[in-house]
Regions:
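C-terminal motif of bacterial Sec signal peptides marking the signal peptidase cleavage site
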Residues: 17-21
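Sec-dependent N-terminal signal peptides
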Residues: 6-16
């Protein structure tokens, strides 16, 4: 009898531990816990990778265009100390995707046609016009965006900064990392994009429309 009781205690103890373990496994983890710190740490890691790219990876960083655009005289003369959040960071498929040759730069007033997806650092997708893996031979759903100086509240500084360095028909999509200071700031946007969110965009420019482009006959 004592042996049976002993085994029963052992079995119950094992079941209790099992249930306790299951309960811990099913605890709901807040994906936005310590959100500011996680995003700042994530951006620091991206800045480090961009500064010291692994073999075979192509990275560039682009300065927030508004630093010089808002006050070109004072910003060019003052010893401004750039921070990691003063840049957007772009990972390209190849070095050839960076160099534009004689292609005109994207500028204010232009319209760009592009395929894109937007994500947060926890993998939550918040926007886009395609799903899954981008394939330039298959993807044909492009959205046109006007390039504006943040007149429209839907535009963010980092989005415009990145677009101004894109070119059409790259070998593949580029991945753009935008710090929250160049995104939706401390307040965020809507229910999905919380404050302090680093924005990650997969971006492929299909076409650039220059409304004021002149021809040789106009010169």
């Amino acid at each position: 009898m004592n042996n049976r009781i002993t085994w029963l205690v052992v079995i119950l103890s094992a079941l209790t531990i099992g249930f306790s373990s299951c309960a811990k496994d099913t605890e709901v983890v807040d994906p936005y816990a310590n959100w500011k710190e996680k995003n700042e740490q994530f951006l620091d890691s991206i800045a480090e990778v961009a500064a010291n790219p692994p073999a075979g990876e192509v990275w560039e960083k682009y300065e927030n265009y508004k630093i010089d655009f808002d006050d070109p005289i004072s910003s060019s003369m003052s010893p401004y100390q750039y921070k990691d959040y003063d840049y957007v960071y772009v990972k390209y498929a190849t070095e050839a995707d960076i160099f534009r040759g004689n292609e005109p730069l994207i500028n204010f007033g232009d319209t760009v046609s592009l395929a894109y997806q937007g994500f947060l650092i926890n993998g939550v997708r918040f926007d886009g016009n395609y799903y899954g893996t981008f394939d330039k031979q298959v993807t044909d759903n492009f959205t046109k965006f006007g390039v504006a100086d943040n007149i429209d509240i839907n535009y963010v500084v980092g989005w415009t900064t990145a677009l101004m360095h894109m070119k059409p028909d790259m070998s593949d999509k580029a991945t753009v990392y935008i710090p929250y200071q160049m995104g939706y700031g401390e307040t965020g946007k809507g229910d999905v994009i919380r404050g302090y969110s680093t924005l990650i965009f997969e971006m492929y420019v299909d076409e650039i429309i220059h409304p004021y482009k002149t021809t040789n006959s106009d010169n």
